Amino acid sequence: KLKVMKIIDCITYFDEPMLFELRLNILNDYVDNFIVCEARYTHAGKKKDLNFDIKRYKKFSNKITYIIVEDEPKNLIDYNSSNKSENVVFRINAQKRIYHQREKIFFELKKNYDSNDWIIYSDSDEIPNLMDFNLKTCKNKVVLFNQLLFYYKTHH
């Protein structure tokens, strides 16, 4: 039996509630599910509180899967035992933390979605315009979107 293809939008979340709400409203008609992954550590390795609040997005809550990353990656470089500069180690470890968070999204996708589903992965502020593009009829394996670039500042 052929499964119906789904479109899943995935992001890593830090603390951009207004931006995420904008993303939900823009993509809601085109996306079947949203995966939001938030870590308990910043990219710099500082412990942080969780900021995502599903209650803020009641209208979309049935489409949102929220993943919490409780742990740090196992392969972080120790500043003291490395012959690299502190800045280089900092950047490498930040990339490892980002990868670790993305890996948690991948595990969720592998567990609950099919190989014929479309996966959109981008930063919160990189919102693809799906208005004139039908992923359900697209035969390509990979799609890159041209996007408009906006500089913005929000006041909470």
Model-derived regions, located:
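N-proximal low-complexity "stem/linker" segments adjacent to membrane-targeting elements
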Residues: 2-29
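Short, conserved active-site loop motifs that form the nucleotide-linked donor/cofactor pocket
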Residues: 7, 64, 142
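Short catalytic/ligand-binding loop motif for oxyanion handling, primarily in non-cytosolic enzymes
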Residues: 18-19, 42-46, 74-77, 127-131, ...
